[in-house]
Structures are given as C-alpha cells and as structure tokens.
Amino acid sequence: MVAVLTWALALLSAFATVQTQKGFWDYFSQSSGDKSKVARVQQQKLTWEPTSLKDSLEQDLSNMDKFLEKLGPLSGQGREPPGLPHDPEGMRQQLQEELAEVRARLEPYMAEAHQQVGWNLEGLRRQLKPYTVELMEQVARRVQELQEQLRVVGEGTKAQLLGGVDEARGLLQELQTRVVQHTGRVRELFHPYAQRLVTGIGRHVQELHRSVAPHAAASSARLSRCVQTLSRKLTLKAEALHARIQQNLDQLLEELSAFASAGAGGAEEGANSGPQMLSQEVRQRLQAFRHDTFVQIADFTRAIDQETEEVQLQLAPPPPGHSAFAPEFLQADSSEARSKLQARLEDLWEDINDSLHDRGLSHLEEP
C-alpha cells in the first residue's frame, strides 16, 4: 500500500512542481486533441472538490480505482480511464507504468525547482551566519575580559596573604564584587546581539519568501504558511539561545561567588593555598562557560540547517529518483509512514487544486 502511495506521491509532486513552469502547460495543450477538449477538461478540474481526493486516500487498496478515476482527467484526455485489472498486481504494474512515463517528462522541472529553492535557502543560511559568528566572538571576548579582571584581583590577594589576613580577606571580598559587576555587564552586552539576531531572522526570511516564490511548487497560501512557520521556529530558537546564555551567566556568577567566599574563608583560617585554588577554579569556570555557550550556538546553527532543509522538501520536493525523495516513506510499511504520505498528498492536492483553478480561469477568459 505504501509503495503504491509513494508512486502516487511522485505523480502529484511532478504536477505540483510543473505548475510553476510554462513548459508544462505547453506540453499539456499539445497532448490534448484540440483546444475545446482542453477547455472542457479545465472546467472539469474547476468543479472537483478537494475533499474528494482526500477522502479517497483513506480507502483500502480495493478502492484505488476510484483514486485513479480522479487522476484520470489530469492526463488531458477528457475521457474516463480505461478499465483496470482487478488483480492488485496488475493494477500496481499499470499504475507504475503510467507514473514512470509522466515522471520521465516532468522530472527535469522538479529537479530545477528543487535546486532553485535550495539555492535561496542556502542564501538565507549565509545571511544568518554572521550573527552567530559575531555572537561567538563576543562570548570569547567577554570571557577573556572577565578572566583578566579577576586575575588581577587574584594576584593581589596572593601577595597580600604574605602581609596579613585582613588585607587578603578584603581583596577576596572585592573579588566577589568584581564578579557581580562584570557578569552583569556581560549580561547587558549580550542583549543587543540577541535582538539583532531575532530582527535579522525576520527580515531575511521575508526576503526568502519573495525570492523563492517563482520557483516553489507550493501554492501561494502554503508557501506563506511554510515561510511563517520557518520564521516562527527560528525566532523561538534564537530566543531560547539567548535565554540559555543568560542561564550560563547566572551559573557562572553563582559558582565564582561561591569560590570567592570559600577563598575568603580559607584566608581567615590562614590557608595559603586558598587564592591559588581560587585562581585555578576561576579559569576553569570561565572556560566551561565559554565551551558550553559555544556548543549552544553551534546547536542553533545546525537547527537553522535542519529547518531550511525541511522547508526545501515542503516547497519543492526532489524528483522521485533523487536520494532525498521521501526516504522515510520507503523504509517500512508503518502507520507513521502512511500518515506522512497522506499529509504530503493533501498538501500537494491543495497546490494542484489552486493551480488548476487559477489556470482554468485564465484559459476560460481567453477569446
């Protein structure tokens, strides 16, 4: 069942993609016997109810002939399809032969659309990369500044231990104050970068919408939904990244303050190793903050790649022969695979219905 539906998906993908290409309609007009038949076929397409195909997809293999009857007018013949063999194997073979012929003619259009949409999405990734690179540079710079500020205080504390406990304790208390001040300053500096990232996502995704519209196989309504969903997902991920960086700063502040307090306690007890241990722990905690934040920024970058690849498959699926064509559908005959197939078929049917409606109106208005 899934294999048959996968072939059906190939056919619908082809028709949905080619609706963006003028060459398809030239082929469509030439393959029909005369212009009057084309007009009648287009009028039949305009009267189809989108729900009819959706309902038929939920039937068992025994009802596949009804599904083929609804696809019949797409061939441009203007007549009912010939009788189908009653055995499932013969039906499957006939369907595969017809789909193979259509795929051979339309596959170049699908490949071109998939490539064009991919180029535009790659452009979006390039536009967002400077934001993440700048954020990583700021993290490294602020960590270095914090380390330098705290190192100066730590060295002074170590020297003062030779003179007296009171002086050392005072410097360790100053270290606690410096920790609070500098982590607070770093927190404030990150806010503008996070805001620029969110603003940049919104602007560049809208630019993507305009640039990908001529090449996408999806209808204008579904294209808008996909772009809006992409913008919302990336914005939420950018905001989550900013929140995680703030949490990292909170943790850093808490840990450094705790170590400074421990160092002050060690100074009161006359422990000469306190400041040395503190200096080492400060470096370790700062490097841990830097590492964790870099990992989170890298995860955000990979999320951008993943989301844009998913959008490419939605807006312009690759040809059936492509390695990226519905790999999850071909692995097993599972309910999940069937559900995904139905969801994509419903999207493609929406695209085809909108395209036929628009084209039908334009052809009927011709003198």
Swiss-Prot record:
Chief location of this protein within or outside the cell: secreted
UniProt record, GO biological process: acylglycerol homeostasis; cholesterol efflux; cholesterol metabolic process; lipoprotein metabolic process; phospholipid efflux
Keyword Secreted in annotation: yes
GO molecular function ontology, one term from the record: cholesterol transfer activity
Pfam families found in the cross-reference section: Apolipoprotein
Top-level taxon of origin: Eukaryota
Disordered: annotated span: 71-90
Cleaved signal peptide residues: 1-20
GO cellular component: chylomicron; early endosome; extracellular vesicle; Golgi apparatus; high-density lipoprotein particle; late endosome; very-low-density lipoprotein particle
Post-translational modifications: Phosphorylated by FAM20C in the extracellular medium.
Lipoprotein in keyword set: no
Location in or out of the cell: Secreted; Early endosome; Late endosome; Golgi apparatus, trans-Golgi network
Keyword line: Chylomicron, Coiled coil, Endosome, Golgi apparatus, HDL, Lipid transport, Phosphoprotein, Secreted, Signal, Transport, VLDL
Modified residues (Phosphoserine): S56
InterPro entries for this protein: ApoA_E (IPR000074), Apolipoprotein_A1/A4/E (IPR050163)
Annotated family: Belongs to the apolipoprotein A1/A4/E family.
Known function: Minor apolipoprotein mainly associated with HDL and to a lesser extent with VLDL. May also be associated with chylomicrons. Important determinant of plasma triglyceride (TG) levels by both being a potent stimulator of apo-CII lipoprotein lipase (LPL) TG hydrolysis and an inhibitor of the hepatic VLDL-TG production rate (without affecting the VLDL-apoB production rate). Activates poorly lecithin:cholesterol acyltransferase (LCAT) and does not enhance efflux of cholesterol from macrophages. Binds heparin.
Subunit structure: Interacts with GPIHBP1. Interacts with SORL1; this interaction leads to APOA5 internalization and sorting either to lysosomes and degradation, or to the trans-Golgi network.
Protein known as: Apolipoprotein A-V
Organism: Leptonychotes weddellii (Weddell seal)
